[in-house]
Amino acid sequence: MPQKSRYSDEQVEQLLAELVSVLEKHHTPTDLSLMVLGNMVTNLINTSIAPAQRMLIADSFVHALRASIDEGNIH
């Protein structure tokens, strides 16, 4: 997601590492990780964003997610 952010790379990486650590601690399979993270995103949008802006934010999130997906093979 190559976009200018008000947050430092260090802040983002630290939080990401902590979230990954929690998922690893619980030996969370990929599908469950995606379900939990998706539910977290939904909850954040529904509780922190004005109703009139929710679909715009969700669409922006989906666009950024799709743009950041690496379509290369991992296996």
Swiss-Prot record:
Signal peptide: none annotated. InterPro entries: UPF0352, YejL_sf. SUPFAM superfamilies: YejL-like. Belongs to the UPF0352 family. This is UPF0352 protein PMI0824. The lineage of its organism: Bacteria, Pseudomonadati, Pseudomonadota, Gammaproteobacteria, Enterobacterales.
